[in-house]
């Protein structure tokens, strides 16, 4: 069976994972980096993704897209309050957000597809095989529009999305908690842009989401903004410069704040260095962990309120929680771990990398789907998809065909008509898009109080047991009466548009890969040229003249190749330059060590 990978398509970073020897593993790039920044930029030589794109945040913020996950399955009206936070240009066409890069507009699924293509290519390069199938994770609160947009992104990227699973479920799978017979799990997910808390109930191998809560505008970015405000104020007071008038320098301030926050998870203090605009020198200061925590405490405490609300919604107390799992880079902060442990009364699981845990869990789910997990007995699968009728006579699937059973799915919905007094639930079985082409299983009607459209909160649960018996429950969260519905996205990419994008992705696959390899080779060559040229300038006197001349020749040859269109030639010239400069680099390292140890005793360094 073809390999299935697990993908964490994140707001800030994305990862791809696979199973090896029964254990989930993250796919690294050739430099050993596991995370791909969820950033797409328009450079002079075309669109770039990941680490190289992130570098454009400071140089060209208006042509660099980040946090696109916030816009998946949404229209402009849904994100009005967020528009001021993003330097790039957003428009709307046919109810779909469009992001302008250069002369073209892209939908959020198209941007996300570029990130997925990067992950797909990374996996193919590392594993040495074609990757066409994936499990992708989404936040538990993602509605059907957002889930469908994620599937669309996968299709555009040339991936068959076999399963969309909730991030908290993936985190629990990564820790192997599904091997327990039962239990209640709190998944505390403090990421870059959002905070989510999910309460899961595990019974007989089934994960059920009891409650979710959170804040879509609370994350590590808020901690970064606190540091930015601090640095901007100090720069203004000390140097008389208002960095807010310099967008590129504001990005530099933000990145330095982010780096400092990360360093202080492991260190007690760190040095801040920020280059000032208009060549007015640099701003430096020391920042301690205590200072960061005094700034961050108000933000971190805001995560505890959703936790308490989720516990209340689930009808639980903190002592009822059996396991606590941490997800997201912000949970590395010691203060976060202390407050979470204090709230739930038990130390959280944190031995797995919190940035990687969701992707690892996605790989576990992928392994289950591929039949690779031998210690789990899969009794049966659903032969046909199960879903409900939505607006326009469309079937919306909650439990997909070939889902292992027992299984459950839960979603939150609302109404579309003011004063609506009832909701008709039409349960369907089949694989076709339209209701008329599928098999009708049952109908029921639920009364709801007459409220403005969009106000009712209707929770729908599909539960199919090991005998294949389906139970559908819907609950009006205001009245506690039962109610059920799932909605086909009122906006999103049309089937024709998705198909066209898929066709184009295959039609131009070879051309796209070739162009990408050329861009990557040029970027790597530019970096190697700069570092080698600098090394030669600083330490050329430490090697023989003939050796220095050979390095200069290799530099010239690579510079010429870089301007060409043959990425293989660029890679070859890079290898030649690396070989020519190998001794120089070794001499530089040796010289640096000698100078570092000069005047010290053996006891000082032993």
Labelled PLM ranges:
Residues 1-95, 101-105, 109-114, 121-606:
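Oxyanion-binding/catalytic loops of NTP- or PPi-dependent enzymes
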């Amino acid at each position: 069976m073809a390999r299935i990978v697990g993908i964490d398509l994140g707001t800030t970073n994305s990862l791809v994972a696979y199973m090896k020897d029964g254990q989930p593993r993250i796919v690294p790039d050739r430099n050993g980096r596991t995370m791909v920044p969820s950033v797409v930029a328009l450079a002079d030589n075309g669109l770039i993704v990941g680490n190289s794109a992130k570098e454009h945040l400071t140089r060209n913020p208006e042509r660099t897209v980040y946090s696109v996950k916030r816009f998946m399955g949404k229209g402009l009206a849904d994100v009005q309050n967020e528009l001021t936070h993003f330097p790039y240009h957003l428009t709307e066409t046919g109810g779909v957000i469009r992001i302008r890069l250069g002369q073209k507009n892209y939908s959020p699924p198209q941007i996300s597809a570029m990130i997925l293509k990067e992950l797909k290519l990374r996996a193919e390069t590392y594993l040495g095989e074609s990757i066409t199938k994936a499990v992708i994770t989404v936040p538990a609160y993602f509605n059907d529009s957002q889930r469908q947009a994620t599937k669309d992104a996968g299709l555009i990227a040339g991936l068959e999305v076999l399963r969309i699973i909730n991030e908290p479920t993936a985190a629990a799978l990564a820790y192997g908690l599904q091997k327990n017979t039962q239990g209640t799990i709190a998944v505390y997910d403090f990421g870059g842009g959002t905070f989510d808390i999910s309460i899961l109930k595990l019974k007989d191998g089934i994960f059920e989401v009891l409650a979710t809560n959170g804040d879509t505008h609370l994350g590590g970015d808020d901690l970064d903004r606190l540091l930015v405000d601090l640095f901007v104020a100090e720069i203004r007071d000390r140097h008389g410069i208002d960095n807010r008038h310099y967008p590129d320098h504001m990005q530099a301030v933000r990145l330095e704040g982010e780096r400092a926050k990360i360093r202080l998870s492991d260190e007690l203090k760190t040095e801040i260095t920020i280059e000032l605009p208009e060549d007015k020198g640099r701003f430096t200061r020391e920042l301690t962990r205590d200072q960061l925590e005094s700034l961050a405490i108000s933000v971190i405490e805001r995560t505890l309120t959703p936790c308490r609300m989720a516990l209340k919604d689930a009808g639980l107390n903190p002592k009822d929680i059996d396991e606590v799992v941490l997800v997201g880079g912000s949970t590395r902060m010691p203060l976060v771990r202390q407050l979470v442990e204090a709230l739930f009364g038990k130390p959280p699981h944190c031995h797995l990398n919190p940035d990687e845990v969701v992707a690892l869990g996605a790989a576990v789910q992928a392994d289950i789907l591929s039949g690779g997990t031998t210690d789990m007995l899969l009794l049966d699968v659903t032969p046909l998809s199960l879903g409900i009728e939505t607006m326009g006579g469309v079937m919306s699937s909650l439990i997909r065909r070939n889902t292992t059973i027992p299984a459950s799915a839960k979603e939150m919905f609302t109404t579309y008509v003011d004063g609506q007094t009832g909701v008709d639930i039409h349960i369907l079985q089949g694989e076709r898009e339209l209701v008329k082409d599928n098999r009708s299983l049952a109908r029921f009607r639920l009364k709801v109080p007459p409220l403005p459209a969009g106000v009712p909160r209707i929770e729908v649960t599909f539960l199919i047991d090991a005998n294949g018996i389906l139970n559908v429950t819907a609950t009006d969260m205001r009245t506690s009466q039962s109610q059920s519905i799932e909605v086909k996205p009122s906006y999103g990419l049309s089937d024709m548009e998705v198909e066209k994008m898929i066709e184009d992705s295959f039609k131009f696959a070879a051309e796209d890969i070739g162009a990408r390899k050329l861009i990557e080779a040029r970027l790597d060559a530019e970096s190697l040229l700069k570092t080698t040229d600098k090394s030669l300038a600083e330490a050329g006197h430490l090697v023989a003249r003939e050796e220095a001349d050979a390095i200069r020749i290799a530099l010239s040859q690579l510079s010429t190749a870089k301007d060409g269109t043959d990425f293989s030639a660029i890679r070859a010239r890079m290898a030649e330059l690396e070989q020519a400069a190998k001794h120089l680099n070794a001499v530089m390292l040796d010289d640096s060590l000698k100078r570092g140890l000069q005047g010290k005793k053996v006891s000082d360094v032993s």
